[in-house]
Amino acid sequence: ADHARKELTLNRSMEFGGPGLNSLSADERATLCNMATECSARTGICEADEVLFNRMEMRMPHLNMVEQRLRAVAPDEGAVYHGGVHHIDLSSIRPMVAHPGNPDEGIPSDPTNGAYVNEIGDVSIDIAYGGSCTAGKIDDIAYYAQVCQAAKDSGRTVRDGVEFYIQYGSGVVKDVAVSKGWHQ
């Protein structure tokens, strides 16, 4: 993946924007920005938009949102990015699964170094794991619950002895998961 080459990202900030950003929730944007460090960037930032302002208003009701909107910054027209500008068609990204213990291990030509879900085949599972410091937010846990529910609804079961671990990003996330029945 050209956009993630170390010589383009090392010690730089990665800025995410454009129409695809509108399809990402605030939690997904936080994960995207946190993962920028995985390809050697110092940080990641997203353009300010209504998704951000709505989250700020919900989480920080004491803020003057008119003032916050006026304080938002955007890239200058014609800004130069030393690592380049990369356009990624989000609709072309396929679902991925990382290998246990080493998310960098996998099919080398794919941009996230995981394995394509439809190419994995039959795999004996003894431990299932969801979450992480960057993928343990409310949206992430909701997705895990949706996948588990869809599997259950289609008649799939978990073999006896398979352990399932969920790493919540915070106690608040765990509390939400428990209250919505996702933890079970």
Model segments located where?
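Fe-S-dependent hydro-lyases/dehydratases of central metabolism
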Residues: A1-Q184
